């Protein structure tokens, strides 16, 4: 579960390395799960890239350490909390996605992120 002040690694090549959650988008929501959109501040970025440090961005959560329970009864858990930066059209800002992503992103209409990911779990 991601909440305000949570740090996430960035799973794309947009230039940001770490982001900190500022707000979970939605009506009075406290926690974000896989597939939810958050507003975040870039805390660590690579030089000479499109995303700069202290920039406020939107991101979609693709992996969480918290256990994700599926309708089939399966549960899945990742090793880190990770997100992919998106633009206003909900398309990824980077051209590559690193690491596995959850299948729930396809149900939330983030098909571009799913197609860029090397593995969908």
Swiss-Prot record:
SUPFAM superfamilies in the cross-refs: Ribosomal protein L14
Q: Does the keyword Ion transport apply?
A: no
Q: Name one GO molecular function term.
A: structural constituent of ribosome
Family according to the record: Belongs to the universal ribosomal protein uL14 family.
HAMAP family named in the record: Ribosomal_uL14 (MF_01367)
* Known function: Binds to 23S rRNA. Forms part of two intersubunit bridges in the 70S ribosome.
Q: What is this protein called?
A: Large ribosomal subunit protein uL14
Lineage start: Bacteria, Bacillati, Cyanobacteriota, Cyanophyceae, Synechococcales
């Amino acid at each position: 579960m991601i909440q305000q002040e949570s740090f996430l690694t960035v799973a794309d090549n947009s230039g940001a390395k770490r982001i900190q959650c500022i707000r979970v988008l939605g009506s009075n929501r406290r926690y974000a799960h896989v597939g939810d959109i958050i507003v975040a501040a870039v805390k660590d970025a690579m030089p000479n890239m499109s995303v700069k440090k202290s920039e406020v961005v939107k991101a979609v959560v693709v992996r969480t350490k918290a256990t994700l329970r599926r309708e089939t009864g399966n549960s899945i858990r990742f090793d880190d909390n990770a997100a992919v930066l998106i633009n206003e059209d909900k398309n990824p800002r980077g051209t590559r996605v690193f690491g596995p992503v959850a299948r729930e992103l396809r149900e939330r209409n983030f098909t571009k992120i799913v197609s860029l990911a090397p593995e969908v779990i």
